[in-house]
């Protein structure tokens, strides 16, 4: 089932960027992945010509995520994005859907934490239609109040359907505790409390303030030349006014000086445990070493230390993992596990022990080599479609990685040493300052 909070907060763009950049490697050719062009209206175009099929894929990131929505209007950015396809000054929602379906294409818009995202895929012969539709939904939404009310009801129903899911309850409590009043800390409950008060004016004002060519990155991959795509984008996005982008008031992330336990009562047989703290941003120089370190700790599936200890040696859980959510601002470091209520304390203790061990003991040569081989070896699967290439292009621009990023990546990973692992583990893992959320039958879990 979809996690509504994650859909609202992180959206498609963030999920694609994190997945692609976490494992990108070296391209076979030594040339840059694409070309960067700034259009007359300020829009940044990244183009990768790919002539093997008569198809064009477009990925857009617009600086209109929940980071810039007013603090007292959680969910506004995501709702605005979700309404763009529901009617424009030229087309209603049915017409938009029918026109793209008729040519066998796809068109989508969604909200996220740092960015809103849009995607388009059409045959080369239908590129004009596709760009006409894309520019129309981005530039000319009408935000019909009936559509707003329908989308609000739909979102609230989704939140309500998940309200009793232990994993969602734990995730929301963890997010709120770690990020506080920062935009990354907004939860299902925050969104549900505000959405019913939304009006057309709220969406129109947000759209007018943050949607514009100067806030947009557009990646194009496929059977189209630079001259052709520049001409088409100039044509279909001509007259799109630059966004004023008022500076949002963003609450700082809270500092944490101690370990906190949040015990939530629920009549269930399995305790749902999430523990962690604020992690790193994607642009942190330690990103690559942290990526390798976390693979060894808990990101490497069945080969990770957490899995070896908690699943294989102790039989406490089927799965346990850790992750760093690296975004424009520091995301969360978290470790998650489900175990019997009675073994909750043991599972927590073992996770904390592994956090301490990787901070104090060098990893083995084998662990380091295996992590590097896996991370760099995943590259072919991360650039095997035009959509994935477009996602990487967008990420390259967002995080200032350079168009030669795929060529540099293996060296960046392979340069990580055991000393680097120890250094970044000490810097970015803090077992004495974690938030520990336990959703369980507390009489049996006896969390302390």
Question: Residue spans of the language-model regions?
Answer:
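Boundary at the C-terminal end of the N-terminal hydrophobic targeting segment
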Residues: 24-29
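N-terminal secretory signal peptides that target proteins for export/translocation
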Residues: 1-8
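M16/MPP (pitrilysin/insulinase) zinc-metallopeptidase core fold and M16-derived inactive scaffolds
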Residues: 31-34, 59-121, 186-187, 301-316
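His/Glu-based metal-binding/catalytic segments typifying zinc-dependent metallopeptidases
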Residues: 50, 59-61, 245-303
